C-alpha cells in the first residue's frame, strides 16, 4: 500500500507538471511531452516551486560539461517539480534524431538556427530547464526563455570543464571547426553566458552536484529576496520599538546619497559575504576582471545592478585604459616583501581602481529625472581620478552628472595640481581652496548636511548633491578586489599556498584603502596583520597605539606624501562601527566629540580588539627619501613617497615570518621633485614633462607612465578657479557651477 500510494502520488505530480509544457512543431499543432519523472525519495521540504519562484522557471545555463542536466534533476527532486532537458526533451523529440546527428546533418550555423526555432516554439512554467551549451548563442530564443524564467549560470573552471569533457568522450561541440581547440571554444562562449544570466553559481573544483544544486537554490533565494541586503548609517541607533527597515537603504540609495542624513557613513546591515576555500582556489587562475565580477556580484544585489550589466561595467572600467593587462600586478621586491602596483590606471594612482568603475555604477543607480552634482575633496590623487572617471561616461550620462573637485591650493604637489587642473572636462571642474584637505572634506560634509541649501538646489535647479570620496560606499567597495587579487597572485606565482597568511602594509590617511583590506579578510582572504603606515601626520598611528584620537595642538604638516596628509580620517568611523558591533550610539558620541572637542578616547576593550589585527608606525621625511634611494640602488625600483613610507614602516614592524604586501598607491612620476631629491639628481626648474623625461632616462622599474606623460604636455596652461576657505564661498561656487551645467 505504501509503495502504491507513493507511486500514485508521483504519477499525479508528473501529470500536473507536464500538463503545462507544450511544444509546437511544423508537424504537430500541439503535443504533450512525456518523460519519466522519478524521485529516489519523497521528502518533506520547505522548498516548493510556488514558494521559491512561483510560475517562473529555473533555467540552468552553462557550457558543455557544467553539469546542468544532473543538477537540474537534483533541483527538481528537491522542489517537487518537473525537469526539462532541452537536448532530450525538446530538440530530439522535435527533430526525431539525436543532437549529434542533427549537427552533422546541417552544420554549425544552421544548427543554431534550428535549435533556436525549436526553443521558440516551447513554453513551460514552474519547471527546471537545463539548456544546451549553445542555446545562449541564439538571442531570440533566450529572450523568449528569459520572459518567464530565472537564468542561473553554472560557472565551472575551464580546466575542470576540459577534464569532464574528456571523461565524457566529447570531442566536438557546436561551433568547433578544425583547428579550433576545445579550450579556445569554451573561452569564446563565455561572452554569451555572461550576457544572459540573472544569477551566477561559482562551481569550485571538486564540488558535488548536490552542493551545486544547493548553491543554485541559495542563489535563487537571494535573487528573489530584494530586501535582504541593505545598508545602515554608522550612527544608526536600533530602538526596541523600531524595525530595521525604517532607516535601511538599498545599495543604489547608499551610492546616490553618499553620506547618511545623520552624518554617518553607510555600511552593510549584515556581514560581508564570504567565499569558500574552494571558490577562492578556483579564482587563482582567473583574470582581474573575472575576480572583480565574482566578488562584486556577491556584494551588490542584482535588484540594484543586474549581474550581466555589472559585468559589462567591470569590463569597461578595466579595459584598455589600464597600461598593464594584469590591472594591479604584484611584484617581488626583496626578501619577504612584495609590491602591489596600483598605479597603472589613467591617472597613475590607486584611486583609478575604484574611480574607473564607480561612475558607471553611479550612472546606473540614479533616476533619469534628476541631475546630480558630485562634490569631491581631494588631497592629491582623488581629484584627477574622479574627473577622469566621470569624463568617460556616455554623452547622455555626462549631461546629467557633473563633478567638482575641491583641493587644497597649496597642499598638493605641483604635478598633482597640474593633473587635477588638466583633468577638467565638459562635466568636471577643479577648484583650489586656500586651506588644507581636512577643511575641504569637512566643508563637503557640512554642505551635504545643510538641508536648506541642498533643498534649494533640488527645487530651483532640479539638482541633487552626492559624493565620490571614499565616504561613498560605491567608491570604497571596488578597492576590496585588488587586495584579494594580490593574495591570489602570490598563490598563482607559487610564493605561497592558499591558506598561508600574509600581512599588508598600506600608507594610510583617510583609512579607506586599509579598510578595504579588512573587508577582503572578511570575505575569506587570510590576512594576518594590517600595518598602518603614516607620515609626519601620524594621528592614526597614535590612535592605534593608544586608542586616543587627538587633534588638539596638532597641525597638518605638508610632506613628500601629500595624499596621506590628513588628520580627520573619515573611514575610521566605519571600522570602529564594525569593531563595536554596530553600536551607532557610540559612533555618534565619539565623532560628535571629535567635532566639538577635537578628540575622543575609546575603551580599553576596543583598543585591545583593534591591536589584535592592526600594527602602526610612522616615517619621517628623511627616512622616506632614504628608502627611495636605497631601494633604487639595491633593486633598480623607484618607490613613490607614499610607498616609501610604507616600506620604512614594514621594515620596522613586520616580523618577516610571512610575506608582506606593500600597497604602492601612486606612480613615482607624480612626485618628480621628491624623487629627484631622493636620488640626488640636480633639480632643474623645468616643466613637469621635462622632469618625467629625465627620470625616464634612468630606465628604472616601473617604467615611465606614458598616460601621465601625455597629459603633462597638455595641462600646464589650463585655467581653474580658486576660492577662500569659507563655507558660503564654497556654496556659491557650487551653485554657480550647477547653473552653468544644468540650466
UniProtKB/Swiss-Prot annotation:
In the UniProt record, does the keyword Transit peptide occur? no
User: According to the lineage, what is the superkingdom?
Assistant: Eukaryota
GO CC aspect terms: cytoplasm; mitochondrion
Tell me the Pfam families matching this sequence: SKI, Thr_synth_N
Q: What are the N6-acetyllysine sites (modified residues) in this protein?
A: 281
For activity, the cofactor(s) needed are: pyridoxal 5'-phosphate
For this UniProt record, give its keywords in alphabetical order, as a comma-separated list.
Answer: Acetylation, Pyridoxal phosphate
List the InterPro entries hit by this protein, alphabetically: P-loop_NTPase (IPR027417), Shikimate/glucono_kinase (IPR031322), Shikimate_kinase/TSH1 (IPR000623), Thr_synth_N (IPR029144), Thr_synth_N_sf (IPR037158), Thr_synthase-like (IPR004450), TrpB-like_PALP_sf (IPR036052)
Q: Which residues carry this modification: N6-(pyridoxal phosphate)lysine?
A: 351
Could you tell me which cysteines form disulfide bridges?
Answer: none
User: Which HAMAP family does the record cross-reference, listed alphabetically?
Assistant: Shikimate_kinase
NCBIfam families referenced in this protein's UniProt entry, alphabetically: thrC
User: Matching PANTHER family, A to Z?
Assistant: THREONINE SYNTHASE-LIKE 1
Q: Record's family? A: Belongs to the threonine synthase family.
- Any idea what this protein is called? Threonine synthase-like 1
Protein's gene: THNSL1
Amino acid at each position: 500500500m505504501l509503495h502504491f500510494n507513493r507511486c500514485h502520488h508521483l504519477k499525479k505530480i508528473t501529470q500536473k507538471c507536464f500538463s503545462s509544457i507544450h511544444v509546437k512543431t511544423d508537424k504537430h499543432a500541439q503535443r504533450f511531452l512525456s518523460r519519466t519523472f522519478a524521485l529516489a525519495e519523497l521528502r518533506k521540504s520547505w522548498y516548493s516551486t510556488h514558494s521559491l519562484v512561483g510560475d517562473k522557471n529555473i533555467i540552468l545555463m552553462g557550457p558543455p560539461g557544467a553539469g546542468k542536466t544532473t543538477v537540474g534533476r537534483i533541483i527538481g527532486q528537491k522542489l517537487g517539480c518537473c525537469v526539462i532537458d532541452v537536448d532530450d526533451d525538446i530538440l530530439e523529440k522535435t527533430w526525431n534524431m539525436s543532437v549529434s546527428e542533427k549537427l552533422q546533418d546541417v552544420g554549425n550555423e544552421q544548427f543554431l538556427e534550428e535549435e533556436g526555432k525549436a526553443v521558440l516554439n516551447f513554453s513551460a512554467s514552474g519547471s527546471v530547464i537545463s539548456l544546451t551549451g549553445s542555446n545562449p548563442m541564439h538571442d531570440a530564443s533566450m529572450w523568449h526563455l528569459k520572459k518567464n524564467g530565472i537564468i542561473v549560470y553554472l560557472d565551472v573552471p575551464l580546466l575542470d570543464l576540459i577534464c569532464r569533457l574528456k571523461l565524457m568522450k566529447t570531442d566536438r561541440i557546436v561551433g568547433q571547426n578544425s583547428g579550433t581547440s576545445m579550450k579556445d571554444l569554451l573561452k569564446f562562449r563565455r561572452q554569451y553566458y555572461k550576457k544572459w544570466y540573472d544569477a551566477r553559481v561559482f562551481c569550485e573544483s571538486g564540488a558535488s552536484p548536490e552542493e551545486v544544486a544547493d548553491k543554485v537554490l541559495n542563489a535563487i533565494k537571494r535573487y528573489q529576496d530584494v530586501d535582504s541586503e541593505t545598508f545602515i548609517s554608522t550612527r544608526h541607533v536600533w530602538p526596541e520599538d523600531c524595525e530595521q527597515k525604517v532607516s535601511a537603504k538599498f545599495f543604489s540609495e547608499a551610492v546616490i546619497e553618499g553620506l547618511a542624513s545623520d552624518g554617518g557613513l553607510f555600511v552593510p546591515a549584515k556581514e560581508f559575504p564570504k567565499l569558500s576555500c574552494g571558490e577562492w582556489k578556483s579564482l587563482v587562475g582567473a583574470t582581474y576582471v573575472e575576480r572583480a565580477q565574482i566578488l562584486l556580484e556577491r556584494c551588490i544585489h542584482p535588484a540594484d545592478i543586474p549581474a550581466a550589466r555589472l559585468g559589462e561595467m567591470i569590463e569597461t572600467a578595466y579595459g584598455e585604459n589600464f597600461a598593464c593587462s594584469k590591472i594591479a600586478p604584484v611584484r617581488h621586491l626583496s626578501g619577504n616583501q612584495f609590491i602591489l602596483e596600483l598605479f597603472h590606471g589613467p591617472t597613475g594612482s590607486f584611486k583609478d581602481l575604484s574611480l574607473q568603475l564607480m561612475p558607471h555604477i553611479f550612472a546606473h543607480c540614479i533616476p533619469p529625472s534628476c541631475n546630480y552634482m558630485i562634490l569631491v575633496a581631494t588631497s592629491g590623487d582623488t581629484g584627477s581620478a574622479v574627473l577622469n572617471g566621470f569624463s568617460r561616461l556616455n554623452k547622455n550620462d555626462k549631461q546629467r552628472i557633473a563633478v567638482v573637485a575641491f583641493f587644497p591650493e597649496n597642499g598638493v604637489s605641483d604635478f598633482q595640481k597640474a593633473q587635477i587642473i588638466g583633468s577638467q572636462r565638459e562635466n568636471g571642474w577643479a577648484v583650489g581652496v586656500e586651506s588644507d584637505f581636512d577643511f575641504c572634506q569637512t566643508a563637503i560634509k557640512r554642505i551635504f548636511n545643510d538641508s536648506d541649501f541642498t533643498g534649494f538646489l533640488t527645487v530651483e535647479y532640479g539638482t541633487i548633491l552626492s559624493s565620490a570620496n571614499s565616504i561613498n560606499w560605491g567608491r570604497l567597495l571596488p578597492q576590496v578586489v585588488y587586495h584579494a587579487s594580490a593574495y591570489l597572485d602570490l598563490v598563482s606565482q607559487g610564493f605561497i599556498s592558499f591558506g598561508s597568511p600574509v600581512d599588508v602594509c598600506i600608507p594610510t590617511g583617510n583609512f579607506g584603502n586599509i579598510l578595504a583590506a579588512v573587508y577582503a579578510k572578511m570575505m575569506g582572504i587570510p590576512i594576518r596583520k594590517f600595518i598602518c603606515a603614516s607620515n609626519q601626520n601620524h594621528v592614526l598611528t597614535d590612535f592605534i597605539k593608544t586608542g586616543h584620537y587627538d587633534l588638539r595642538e596638532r597641525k597638518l604638516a605638508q610632506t613628500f606624501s601629500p595624499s596621506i596628509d590628513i588628520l580627520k580620517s573619515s573611514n575610521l568611523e566605519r571600522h570602529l562601527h564594525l569593531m563595536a558591533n554596530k553600536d551607532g550610539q557610540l559612533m555618534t558620541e565619539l565623532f560628535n566629540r571629535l567635532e566639538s572637542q577635537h578628540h575622543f578616547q575609546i575603551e580599553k576593550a576596543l583598543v585591545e580588539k583593534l591591536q589584535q589585527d592592526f600594527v602602526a608606525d610612522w616615517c619621517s621625511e628623511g627616512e622616506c627619501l632614504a628608502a627611495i634611494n636605497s631601494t633604487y640602488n639595491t633593486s633598480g625600483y623607484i618607490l613613490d613617497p607614499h610607498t616609501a613610507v610604507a616600506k620604512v614602516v614594514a621594515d620596522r614592524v613586520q616580523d618577516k615570518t610571512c610575506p608582506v604586501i606593500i600597497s604602492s598607491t601612486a606612480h613615482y612620476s607624480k612626485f618628480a621633485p621628491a624623487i629627484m631629491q631622493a636620488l640626488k639628481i640636480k633639480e632643474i626648474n623645468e616643466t613637469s614633462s621635462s622632469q618625467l623625461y629625465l627620470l625616464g632616462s634612468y630606465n628604472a622599474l616601473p617604467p615611465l607612465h606614458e598616460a601621465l606623460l601625455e597629459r603633462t604636455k597638455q595641462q600646464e596652461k589650463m585655467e581653474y578657479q580658486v576660492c577662500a576657505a569659507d563655507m558660503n564661498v564654497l556654496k556659491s561656487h557650487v551653485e554657480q557651477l550647477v547653473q552653468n551645467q544644468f540650466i
